[in-house]
Amino acid sequence: GEVTSKGHGELQADIDNLKAGMAAHGATRGFMNAASPGVISLFLQNQHYATREAYLAALADAMKEEYETIVGAGLDLQLDCPDLALSRHMLFADLSDDEFVKIAAMHVEALNHALREIDPARVRVHICWGNYEGPHVCDIDMDKVFSTLMKTRARYVLFETSNPRHAHEWT
């Protein structure tokens, strides 16, 4: 069926728990993770919408409220976006790198749509190629997706590239 929010009861409980823990330890700044529209589409495949774009748009609209609720509670928002790298070899292995970059750009566009009313200074994005035990020989190179990744409406972009497969990209 259509993508809809199931409400913010569980989210509010998570926010309340985090803020209580922060207060108990004197922390004045905290962040809460949330899934990006793209990562949701990676693990929950579209079974309703006519196109991937329509599915991503529906996910972005549904997640927008969650993102705004987190930031509205005084927390920073961390979006987990392994879809911008990991999905290259998980879901889109049949595409060329250039075709995948177009998919990643579509995911960034959906994410930015959901973030359009949030100050980028309150947002960080986590991008990775997956934390599975394996050689990572099918990972897309950072230089092929970097400019697309940097278009996210986030001041902070975190790249998890500490496995040996990506060492050459930082040295």
Segments and roles (model prediction):
Residues 1-171:
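Domain-level signal for soluble alpha/beta catalytic cores
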